[in-house]
């Protein structure tokens, strides 16, 4: 029993395979599970069970994703793999599978291909902080110089998108070789696992980040003042803390004089909890749904940003027709809709359902945001797109 308890405190890290179609992402996923189970213990998963990915719905978008888990001596990994290119695009944009690091799979026989580039760009846009490269199918390349050339190309491509191409780990291996139990290639999988352990830092836990709570509801309580309710997204709210009310209107600051949960008074509320916060001297009409309560100075309101957007297909309940510049939908951030104007990249006249696109947005009211914030695009209450804030313009 004590072993079980010990396992649970291992740091938990989310990773995933990205890269061009048929470069071996799913084979590598199976090879990692199988090899690490053999070396460190744990459950092996075969190719077929991973490739047969169940479809999930995230905000109404259908995404096929396989989730596997594996352990190294120091960490527990949750790993996502998608069968199709479109699934990757949707996954990365919706944040359905948040990644603390990505494993970019590049076949040594092909070198970088169009989707290699697209996945690196998406990784940059949606904020995947670390990338490790696994050069696959190296058993099919006899020429050492060719391997070096491919590695150089991949490193240059990563540098082009602001990843540290010169410094990040590149492992040359063969996923199939490792799956077939060939020792030299199994060793490369262990090397990849060691690179994950050493190169991807332990993610900061939500509770350790600066306090933020999206406001869902506002009540005034006779004789006590104004209470705002919501689910704490990150950090801790202590009674007596100074808090900022950010978004929609000018930012104001007040003091939290009470925290309650299920009508019980608490000393603090923590990330993941639904609480009510009593605000000193704040009137009922000074706060509204869509604003956030946050540690002062930790987040600022903005109206203009660049985003990466996936437009739902007709089958997913999205639009049946394309949209053009001048389109003015609602952008749903956390708890509220705000109208915004879009501008499309140069040379793009229209956007079709099922496309993914970079677009600049200008909202009619400011929203508390930082890069990496997810949103939905809605028309009359139905979701027609999903996006992520890639870059904020002041």
UniProtKB/Swiss-Prot annotation:
Gene name tied to this protein: tuf1
Full protein name: Elongation factor Tu
EC code(s) of this entry: 3.6.5.3
Keyword field contains NADP: no
Region G4: start-end pairs: 136-139
Binding-site list for Mg(2+): 26
Known catalytic reactions: GTP + H2O = GDP + phosphate + H(+)
Region (G3): 81-84
Top EC class for this record: hydrolase
Subcellular location: Cytoplasm
SUBUNIT field: Monomer.
Annotated residues for binding of GTP: 19-26, 81-85, 136-139
Chain positions covered by the region annotation G5: 174-176
């Amino acid at each position: 029993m004590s072993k079980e308890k010990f396992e649970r405190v291992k740091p938990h890290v989310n990773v995933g395979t990205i890269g061009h179609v048929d470069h071996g992402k799913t084979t590598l996923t199976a090879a990692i599970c199988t090899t690490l189970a053999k070396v460190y213990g744990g459950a092996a998963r075969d190719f077929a069970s991973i490739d047969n990915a169940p479809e999930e719905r995230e905000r109404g978008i259908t995404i096929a994703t396989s989730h596997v888990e594996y352990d190294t001596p120091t960490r527990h990994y949750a790993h996502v793999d998608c069968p199709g290119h479109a699934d990757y695009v949707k996954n990365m944009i919706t944040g359905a599978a948040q990644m603390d690091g990505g494993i970019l799979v590049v076949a040594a026989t092909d070198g970088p291909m169009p989707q290699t580039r697209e996945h690196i760009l998406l990784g940059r846009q949606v904020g995947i902080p670390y990338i490790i490269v696994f050069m696959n199918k190296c058993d099919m390349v006899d020429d050492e110089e060719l391997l070096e050339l491919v590695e150089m190309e991949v490193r240059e491509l990563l540098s082009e998108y602001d990843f540290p191409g010169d410094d990040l780990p590149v492992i040359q291996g063969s996923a199939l070789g490792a799956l077939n139990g060939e020792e030299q290639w199994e060793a490369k999988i262990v090397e990849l696992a060691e690179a994950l352990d050493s190169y991807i830092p332990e993610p900061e836990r939500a509770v350790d980040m600066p306090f933020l709570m999206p406001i869902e509801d506002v009540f005034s309580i006779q004789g006590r003042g104004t209470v705002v309710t919501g689910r704490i997204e990150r950090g801790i709210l202590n009674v007596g803390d100074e808090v900022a009310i950010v978004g929609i209107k000018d930012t104001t600051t007040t003091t939290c004089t009470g925290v309650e949960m299920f009508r019980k008074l608490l000393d603090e509320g923590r990330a993941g909890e639904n609480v009510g916060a009593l605000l000193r001297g704040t009137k009922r009409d000074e706060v509204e749904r869509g604003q956030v309560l946050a540690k002062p100075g930790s987040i600022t309101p903005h109206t203009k940003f660049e985003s990466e957007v996936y437009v739902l297909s007709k089958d997913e309940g999205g639009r049946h027709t394309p949209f053009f510049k001048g389109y003015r939908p609602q952008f749903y951030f956390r708890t509220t809709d705000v109208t915004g104007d879009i501008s499309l990249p140069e040379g793009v006249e229209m956007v079709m359902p099922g496309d993914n696109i970079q677009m600049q947005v200008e909202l009619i009211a400011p929203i508390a945001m930082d890069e990496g914030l997810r949103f939905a695009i809605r028309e009359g209450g139905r979701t027609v797109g999903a996006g992520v804030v890639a870059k904020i313009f002041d």
